[in-house]
């Protein structure tokens, strides 16, 4: 946790909301006590959030061909929350840092080959009860679970009329 993140978590334990907003990737080295990434290069909205006992799992996903950046080694990743005192601002809740560049992930916007990436981050929130995330539109595709849920939805989720399916003459017994 960053110093700001620690304060947000303590306030969350006292009943304030903890609202995760985005995840940023950079190629800097923030160092101890940092409240922000040293060199943020990519900012992604959260695609999904799942709460467990003392943690929240945040997922982000993207396709390399949609990135408007040059390639970089992601040596720092920051998870951001809404500032509890000013909802128009964000605070860095926690930072992950890789000091050995060769162990970091390379974010490659190379358009010659499509790479779809999903990252899941398990973030400690202790016993804070009011935890949420501002979800953005994913930049990739539906997950297998989402596709299976849609496939198994027998309530005509696309609202296709019987006539369009060639079943206009069949009586609806549902």
Regions found by a protein language model. Name each.
Residues 1-137:
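N-terminal assembly/attachment segments of tailed bacteriophage virion structural proteins
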């Amino acid at each position: 946790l960053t110093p700001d993140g620690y304060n947000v978590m303590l306030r969350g334990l006292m009943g304030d909301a903890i609202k995760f907003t985005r995840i940023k990737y950079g190629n800097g080295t923030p160092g101890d006590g940092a409240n922000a990434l040293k060199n943020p290069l990519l900012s992604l909205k959260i695609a999904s959030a799942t709460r467990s006992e003392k943690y929240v799992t945040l997922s982000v996903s993207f396709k390399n061909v949609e990135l408007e950046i040059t390639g970089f080694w992601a040596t720092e990743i920051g998870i951001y929350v809404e500032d509890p005192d000013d909802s128009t601002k964000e605070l860095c809740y926690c930072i992950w840092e890789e000091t050995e560049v060769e162990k970091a992930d390379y974010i490659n916007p190379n358009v010659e080959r499509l790479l779809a990436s999903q990252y899941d981050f398990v973030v400690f929130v202790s016993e804070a009860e009011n935890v949420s995330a501002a979800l953005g539109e994913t930049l990739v595709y539906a997950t297998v679970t989402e596709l299976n849920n849609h496939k198994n939805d027998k309530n005509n989720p696309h609202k296709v009329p019987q006539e369009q399916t060639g079943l206009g003459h069949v009586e609806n017994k549902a």
